[in-house]
Swiss-Prot record:
Transmembrane segments: none annotated. This is Uncharacterized secreted protein ARB_07590. Keywords: Glycoprotein, Secreted, Signal. InterPro entries: DUF4360. PANTHER family: PSEUDOURIDINE SYNTHASE RSUA_RLUA-LIKE DOMAIN-CONTAINING PROTEIN, PTHR38847. The keyword Signal applies. Residues 21-66 are annotated as: Disordered. Its main location: secreted. It comes from the Eukaryota. Pfam families: DUF4360.
Length: 245
């Protein structure tokens, strides 16, 4: 059951909480000024889930959970500029909590074009026993899309390890008119899975973005990595295997 324990452990690694973080700033709900959509109010939103969580890979290919630790996180980007991300590492060094305040893309009359695309580069340092390596096989994202006709929104993520050129990417595009919460489960193609180096700790990089385009310059849209409070929830699932060399 070690593999199941590892998956449960790292599935929480980037989970979001709304509790104050001791020693850091106190995050809170931020009200977002939505564009003026026809009707004057935001209609009821549905929830979309793209796929179910994949099964545990099983077997004895995972390291002891007590020897897997998140030792540091760095970040940067227009969606997470300095000072806009709260983070805390649990006492057992097993859980990383991140809360983003400015991960929102907007488009429409009077909106600066710089607001059409937001991105965030995350670097997550993991320490784990030698003889093992891991890969990201899926990630969950939760957000909100309100797009008028003529507006398209894209959420994309790229995963890679420091010092390696191989990448795994996932992407989803919505076309307006649409108004809904979304829950995405991105599962990497098995043929393009990227593994951390053997015999070395893995620095996992996640470069994510939300982007809006429009064929009608009068159309409006907003795309976030969570609903109106704009807190961003991301859960990363990993697969372990023993090194073969």
């Amino acid at each position: 059951m070690k593999s199941a324990a590892i998956l449960a452990l790292l599935a929480q690694a980037l989970a979001v909480t709304a509790q104050p973080v001791e020693g850091d700033r106190t995050p809170g709900t931020r009200t977002l000024d939505l564009p003026n959509f026809p009707g004057g109010s935001v209609p009821t939103r549905g929830v979309e889930k793209r796929a179910d969580l994949p099964p545990d890979n099983g077997g004895g290919n995972a390291p002891d959970p007590d020897k897997v630790h998140i030792v540091g996180v760095t970040y940067g980007g227009t969606g997470c500029p300095d000072g806009t991300v709260s983070h805390v590492l649990s006492d057992d060094r097993q859980i990383m909590t991140l809360i983003f305040d400015q991960y929102v893309a907007q488009i429409g009359p009077g909106v600066n074009t710089k607001e059409n695309r937001k991105n965030c580069q995350l670097n997550i340092n993991l320490r784990y026993p030698g003889g093992f390596q891991f890969s990201v096989f899926s990630a969950d994202y939760r957000g909100y899309a309100n797009l008028e006709k003529g507006v398209s929104g894209t959420q994309k993520s790229i995963y890679y390890f420091s010092g390696q050129t191989e990448q795994t990417s996932t992407s989803t595009t919505w076309k307006g008119p649409i108004d809904k919460d979304y829950i995405l489960h991105d599962e990497a193609n098995q043929t393009s899975t990227v593994w951390s180096p053997c015999g070395a700790n893995g620095a996992l990089n996640i470069n994510s973005q939300v982007r809006l385009t429009a064929t009608d310059r009068n159309a409006r849209g907003i795309l976030t990595n969570d609903s109106v409070d704009t807190s961003f929830k991301q859960i990363v699932h990993v697969r372990w295997q023993q090194c073969t060399n």
